[in-house]
Amino acid sequence: MAKKETTAKKSAEKKVAAPKKAATKKPAAKKVVAKRIVDQTEPEHIGLVKNDSWLEPFEGAIRGRHDHAVWKLNQLTQNGKKKLSDFATGHLYFGLHKLAKGWVFREWAPNATDIYLIGDFNNWQEDEKYRCKRIEGTGNWELKLSEKALKHGQLYKMKVKWNGGEGERIPAWCRRVVQDDNTKIFSAQVWNPEKTYEFQKKNFKPKKNPLLIYECHVGMGQDAEKVGTYTEFKDNVLPRVIKDGYNCIQVMAIQEHPYYGSFGYHVSSFFAPSSRFGTPEELKELIDTAHKNGIAVIMDIVHSHAVKNEVEGLGNLAGDPNQFFYPGDRHEHPAWDSLCFDYGKDDVLHFLLSNCKYWLEEFKFDGFRFDGVTSMLYYSHGLGEAFGGYGDYFNGHEDDNAICYLTLANRMRSC
């Protein structure tokens, strides 16, 4: 037997040696390098299966999720020519912006036939001077105004028209929304204070070993029987958090919402910090103060659904109820009385990923706790599901688009 094994071994060595010899003569044989590249890019989930053999029956599903995310990443970044963070810059383009000379306003409303800005500056009437123009070949609208056309603090909305209807709407990308104390009506607000907040703590790095999180609600987390403010939280609650040894706060209900009883989870304006608690500058000061005291700040971000309100929210921005949301049976959440985002649309990904980048860069949040993840991942929204074994997580009823979105959001800073 030993002799046969030796012979077989020599024979095998000869078979391996032959292509090596040929490779020195033929440059084409260098294609073997491509095999090494492929091996190096094997998806990380292979390691998941090796670490947990119970996942082996679902390896195909895991591969599929990985491949879907890689495919979408390549599509959005032009096969790596750009970064994912470059794609997530909608907040720098859409919305109302002060320029060196004048103002510019842009909105994504492909179903609209006409858009006006109405507000304090034109007595809330349609005015040709404040009429937007559709950018040719797109669903985007644009309005350029002179320096004196708008002033800080003025209230405004869009007057949107579409085939068969019209309505007043708060712009999807607006950064400041306020509610009238008497009428209770919400409006967008021109926000361009003379003095902007400058962060004093630069390049803050959270302590993670371990991360001790204090979950809090700015409005409800204080002793007084009223809606608390960013400043009151900074002055009264943050010192107790520091004293008790926490190194992170998880802040609930920051995005603007019409109904306070929702705790902030029926969001209407995704780029506007809730004005109930104060100004954007006061929120920045709260976060900066936390950082100066070694406290990281995580934001509860709501991308699992949106409020149904049409005037305040995205429910029917320009006559198309499905502009941001799934059509048909998946349009409304069966338990939350809200609308479900269509994560399969690139424009919706653009909106949500830009929203993530906006909060990270503009307010220096250190990260997110994504709300309602189970609701996003499964067609059932997790309702009536026991999730008693791995099979329940890979039952074929998952929303691959939502999984892809969360994957991209989690990788955005590194891509």
Pin down the residues of each PLM region.
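Substrate-binding/active-site clefts of carbohydrate-active enzymes
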Residues: V178, T196, Q200-K208, I213, ...
